[in-house]
């Protein structure tokens, strides 16, 4: 029996989603595999985990530009060294888990898990394969620390593979599989049934609007953009998802009522029906987290990017814009003009959908698991 640990960390939801997709795929498609899913930071030190995840979310929410500076400064120099040294110290606790479980493979969807395991391998306390699964569309050097002890790097696209190779990672270690994706986004759904269940019309184009966000970024800007969509007269209907942000849900509902658009706008809080909703949508409006981006591309959906967190999400937005699958609404853009241009230009929408499907790596999770388990 093979033993696998998949580590993630709770700095944003994407690392857990990617880790869970790998675990679910292996459990569904492989026999004789014992696989565990563990939050590495929560496991090694609950207090450190609480302090650092709270600091990350508060910075991203309240002072995003400051977070952007941290992101770039942690590529190298003192900040990068502090992070690496901290993970070396924290690895002592992780070592006990690894010694008890004796995994054949350790997978990490966050650089901290990779650093801890690579350091233990360097110290000859760990003797197994280490795999890193990168969950954005541009590399950050934190992923590459102690890379000589890492066996696999799974990245989102070929250009990223070239970038890692230029940073000294051997080509044979790098696989452009794409970011792990839940199988739910690959299923075929009965569109008429889904439209009916959400009270939506088959005669209108559907916009899926992710407006809450994990960190409630850019409230006033989000509401301004949302209002422009709600007021738009291009025969559209909107499903707005506020996530766990109750205040944003109230703001959405108030705006919809004020504009008397209840028939054309549905406001939801957290929902597990995102795969179904994407299957009936024509456009996604979202901040460009790695996982939401991956899911949108897999469903062949053009993306309107709003409120990217400085750092990784701005890099994701740049990648999407460069590949002509997204329109990035920036600070002083005329949102109404952008929307009218988009909805009145069906050729442009079709081309964006085609490019999204071409850019997507829908078999990402399957391909990662095949490489890890040497099928």
Roles of regions detected by a PLM:
Residues 331-348:
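C-terminal "capping" alpha-helix adjacent to the active site of nucleotide-linked donor transferases
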Residues 69-168, 173-176:
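Active-site and donor-binding regions of nucleotide-sugar-utilizing enzymes
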Residues 192, 201-280:
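Donor-nucleotide binding loops and adjacent catalytic segments primarily
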Residues 151-214:
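A nucleotide-sugar donor-handling region in carbohydrate enzymes
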Residues 348-362:
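A short, well-ordered alpha-helix in the C-terminal region of glycosyltransferases
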Residues 362-375:
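C-terminal alpha-helical cap of glycosyltransferases
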Residues 279-288:
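Acidic donor-binding loop of glycosyltransferase active sites
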């Amino acid at each position: 029996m093979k033993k696998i640990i998949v580590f993630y960390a709770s700095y944003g939801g994407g690392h857990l989603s990617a880790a869970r997709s790998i675990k679910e795929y292996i459990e569904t498609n492989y026999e004789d595999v014992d696989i565990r899913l563990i939050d590495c930071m929560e496991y090694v030190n609950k207090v450190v985990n609480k302090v650092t995840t709270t600091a990350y979310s508060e910075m991203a929410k309240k002072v995003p530009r400051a977070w952007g500076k941290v992101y770039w400064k942690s590529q190298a120099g003192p900040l990068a060294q502090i992070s690496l040294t901290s993970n070396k110290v924290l690895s002592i606790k992780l070592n006990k888990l690894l010694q008890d479980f004796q995994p054949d493979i350790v997978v990490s969807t966050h650089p901290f898990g990779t650093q801890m395991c690579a350091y233990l391998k360097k110290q000859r306390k760990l003797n197994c394969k280490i795999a890193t699964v990168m969950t954005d569309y541009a590399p950050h050097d934190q992923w590459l620390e102690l890379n000589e002890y890492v066996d696999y790097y799974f990245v989102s696209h070929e250009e990223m593979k070239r970038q890692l190779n230029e940073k000294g990672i051997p080509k044979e270690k790098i696989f452009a599989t794409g970011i792990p994706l839940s199988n739910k986004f690959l299923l075929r759904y009965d569109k008429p049934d889904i439209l009916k269940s959400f009270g939506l019309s088959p005669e209108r184009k559907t916009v899926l609007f992710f407006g809450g966000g994990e960190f409630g970024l850019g409230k006033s800007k989000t509401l301004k953009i949302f209002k422009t969509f709600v007021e738009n007269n291009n025969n559209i209907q909107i499903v707005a998802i506020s996530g766990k942000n109750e205040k944003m849900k109230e703001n959405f509902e108030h705006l919809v009522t004020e504009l008397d658009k209840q028939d054309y706008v549905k406001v939801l809080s957290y929902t597990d029906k995102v795969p179904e909703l994407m299957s009936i949508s024509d456009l996604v409006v979202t901040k460009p987290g790695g996982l939401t981006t991956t899911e949108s591309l897999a469903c062949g959906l053009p993306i309107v990017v709003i409120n990217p967190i400085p750092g990784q999400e701005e890099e994701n937005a740049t990648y999407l814009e460069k590949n002509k699958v997204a329109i990035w609404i920036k600070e002083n853009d005329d949102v109404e003009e952008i929307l009218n241009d988009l909805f009145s230009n069906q050729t442009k929408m079709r081309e964006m959908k085609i490019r999204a499907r071409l850019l997507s790596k829908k078999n990402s999770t399957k391909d990662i698991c095949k490489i890890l388990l040497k099928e």
